[in-house]
């Protein structure tokens, strides 16, 4: 079992740190689990450059299909973020007629280290199992620009990949 290391950092708003991470490491692999500062939304988690990803697609009996629940049973320790779709139930309810889905039934990534923000008390920590990775991220953040661009780029909707069309999505929701 890897020991979790946690180090307090000076408080900075999550949006500032996310901008730094994106500038340092790129946007691909950047995760932001947001909160609103309420009792249920106290925490924000940021991570970048996943050290591992797991993706399962397909239904039982299909060529190349992989069981998402079996994948979950064999995860290494760490901070995992992602999703398990409703269609993953095809592996536990094989008698039901499950529709094929272009989206993975499981997609998760492990980030080490992560940054944890307590919005209520304005505390910030870096957490991870690899002290060298923690030090490297701290060093990178210490030298990265801290100002947000005054002219931020809009969300590049044309760069998004749509895995289903509008009709396929609507049918999958039904």
Model-found features: residue ranges?
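Signature of the chorismate-utilizing enzyme
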Residues: 1-174
